[in-house]
Amino acid sequence: MGLFDKFLKKEEEINLPALEVADDEIVALADGELIDIATVPDPVFAEQMMGKTCAFKYGEGKVVLCAPANGTLGVLFPTGHAYGVVMNNGVELLVHCGVDTVNAKGEGFRLLNKKQGDAVKAGDPIVEADIKKLSQNYDMSTMLIITNDNGLGLEFVDPQPVVRGQKVTK
């Protein structure tokens, strides 16, 4: 901590209304559109090679991406482009914001008040993404992947408009 650190402007916290979500539910990360996964221009996601996958599109500007379920933040990439949640029932989820956005090296992403290993509730803010800035160089489809469904046979709902906290599995 430097001598003048206390004078530096701190980033303001992002507070969103708390959600009441059951431990076995998977929900939308933010307000947007759940789109057909086959339209994502990356075969790893479009062909669901990592597990059952859905994709979201968000409006221009900044979007706060939240935890899709109750559990533990199992992984949080320092670049902000991806994070994973291990649900309380053992189901493992991965959120990947944009295609090839690892190449942005964190530009356009801001980590929010959570760190790897933290307990999270569905709807807790994890990352802020500047969709307008990032979409200049990347497809900004945001994928939600069930990398391990713990034998539950989970399926995503059909494409539709969604709001943060809306259940997205059948």
Question: At which residue positions do the language-model features occur?
Answer:
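Contiguous, well-folded functional domains in the mature portion of proteins
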Residues: 2-170
